[in-house]
């Protein structure tokens, strides 16, 4: 496993809103490179770190950080993971919903449309791969997936191009798919033409929106009074789910408008550009 750098997005803002207190128990629900978790530990908190990716779990365990308990699992099963540790209430929960830099930088995981790799896109080890989805899904279902989960205006044209290509030979790699999309839609000013297609497939393969809804409901339940929930979303579908949940959850919303990266952070870390942070607090009954 080669070392890679992980740049936590909205690092200071997330930790400040989490309001870490020494001795408190906090959940980093998307442990990844443990960037945010380290910040919580440095402020005296104890951290339960969840990640469904076995590689991320192995990396985090290898750090041997005092006060960090690493658990492999999906955050949609938050209550189950906490129960297994004998934990009923926590003082704060943080979720960074972005694709980990480790995933994007490792071509073998199949998340990047710029680096050749197998069409996988699974965060964990379960479920269908992106390769299975693009080679098996009927035209109408594929177009709907791209339109609804990728917010892709040319969904039908891309779906048609995918179906035409797979009739000649199976679509095997990330760059193969990216080229099919590029030829179908042509040049775009705003980013790579395959960006929204890859987003849609990743969300579908990992059932991300349903997992997020389940996580948020459980997070509100396990927070102790005064405990805080901090969520960083990276696209409008995620942010919409978080915004709606916070509005309807009964939690006290701490961010009237979402926090976004400064121009300096966005320049230093282009992947942070679309991030939106929302936070809420569980009030005493």
UniProtKB/Swiss-Prot annotation:
CC terms in the record's Gene Ontology section: cytoplasm
UniProt keyword annotations, A-Z: Cytoplasm, Methyltransferase, rRNA processing, S-adenosyl-L-methionine, Transferase
Enzyme Commission identifier(s): 2.1.1.199
Entry-linked InterPro entries: RsmH (IPR002903), SAM-dep_MeTrfase_MraW_recog (IPR023397), SAM-dependent_MTases_sf (IPR029063)
Principal subcellular localisation of the protein: cytoplasm
Gene3D superfamilies: Putative methyltransferase TM0872, insert domain, Vaccinia Virus protein VP39
Localization, UniProt: Cytoplasm
TM segment ranges: none
Keyword Glycoprotein tagged: no
Family: Belongs to the methyltransferase superfamily. RsmH family.
Stated role: Specifically methylates the N4 position of cytidine in position 1402 (C1402) of 16S rRNA.
Protein name as catalogued: Ribosomal RNA small subunit methyltransferase H
Organism annotation: Thermus thermophilus (strain ATCC 27634 / DSM 579 / HB8)
Gene that encodes it: rsmH
């Amino acid at each position: 496993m080669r070392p890679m750098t992980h740049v936590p997005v909205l690092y200071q803002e997330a930790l400040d809103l989490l309001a870490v207190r020494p001795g408190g128990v906090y959940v980093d629900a998307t442990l990844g490179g443990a960037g945010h978790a380290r910040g919580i530990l440095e402020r005296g908190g104890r951290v339960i770190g969840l990640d469904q990716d076995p590689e991320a779990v192995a990396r985090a365990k290898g750090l041997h950080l005092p006060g960090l308990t690493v658990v492999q699992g999906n955050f949609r099963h938050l209550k189950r993971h906490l129960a297994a540790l004998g934990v009923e209430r926590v003082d704060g929960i943080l979720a960074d919903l972005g694709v980990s830099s480790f995933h994007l930088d490792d071509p073998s995981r199949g998340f990047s449309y710029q680096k050749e790799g197998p069409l996988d896109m699974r965060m964990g080890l379960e479920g269908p791969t992106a390769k299975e989805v693009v080679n098996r899904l009927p035209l109408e279902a594929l177009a709907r997936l791209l339109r609804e989960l990728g917010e892709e205006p040319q969904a039908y044209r891309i779906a048609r191009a995918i179906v035409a290509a797979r009739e000649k030979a199976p679509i095997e790699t990330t760059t193969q798919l990216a080229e099919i999309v590029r030829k179908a839609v042509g040049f775009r000013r705003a980013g790579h033409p395959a960006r929204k297609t890859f987003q849609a497939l990743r969300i579908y393969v990992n059932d991300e929106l349903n997992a997020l809804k389940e996580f948020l409901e459980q997070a509100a339940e396990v927070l102790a009074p005064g405990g805080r929930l901090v969520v960083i979303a990276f696209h409008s579908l995620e942010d919409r789910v978080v915004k709606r949940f916070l509005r309807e959850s009964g939690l006290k919303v701490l961010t009237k408008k979402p926090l976004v990266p400064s121009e300096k952070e966005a320049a230093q870390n282009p992947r942070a550009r679309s991030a939106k942070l929302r936070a809420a607090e569980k009030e005493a009954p």
